[in-house]
Amino acid sequence: MTGNDPFANALSALNNAESVGHLEQTVSPASNEIGSVLEVFYDRGYIDGFSFVDDGKAGEFEVELKGAINECGPVKPRYSAGADEFEKWEKRFLPARDYGTLVVTTSHGIMSHYEAREQGVGGQVIAYVY
């Protein structure tokens, strides 16, 4: 799968693999951003795990799926959200209150919007998953 946006391609590949029932998916090329988002997915229970495989180029991630993702995708353009503004973006991208996760990049790293709200930091919304 090639294109201009490896991040969007990775989320699309996960979405497609989940919809047809695959238990594993290879995501390439690998990047720190994709790895951090996969870590959030793992922490929130959407995937069983992932590992980095060095293929001599950019590398790739082997993702173990568990059928918990109904939909995931990138947020384009990347909207800025203050620590008290996440509810607005939850209403826009998630199907119900407290169902799903927004992935946010902050000055403290990439994390879920729940963690960002607890820490009282804002950032840019880069992805969603439910």
UniProtKB/Swiss-Prot annotation:
GO cellular component, as recorded: ribonucleoprotein complex; ribosome
Record carries keyword rRNA-binding: yes
MF term (GO), any: rRNA binding
Disulfide-bonded cysteines: none
Biological process, per Gene Ontology: translation
One family name in Pfam for this protein: Ribosomal_S8
Domain of life: Archaea
Family: Belongs to the universal ribosomal protein uS8 family.
Subunit structure: Part of the 30S ribosomal subunit.
PANTHER family named in the record: 40S RIBOSOMAL PROTEIN S15A
Protein's name in the database: Small ribosomal subunit protein uS8
Source organism of this protein record: Haloarcula marismortui (strain ATCC 43049 / DSM 3752 / JCM 8966 / VKM B-1809)
Organism ancestry: Archaea, Methanobacteriati, Methanobacteriota, Stenosarchaea group, Halobacteria
Gene for this chain: rps8
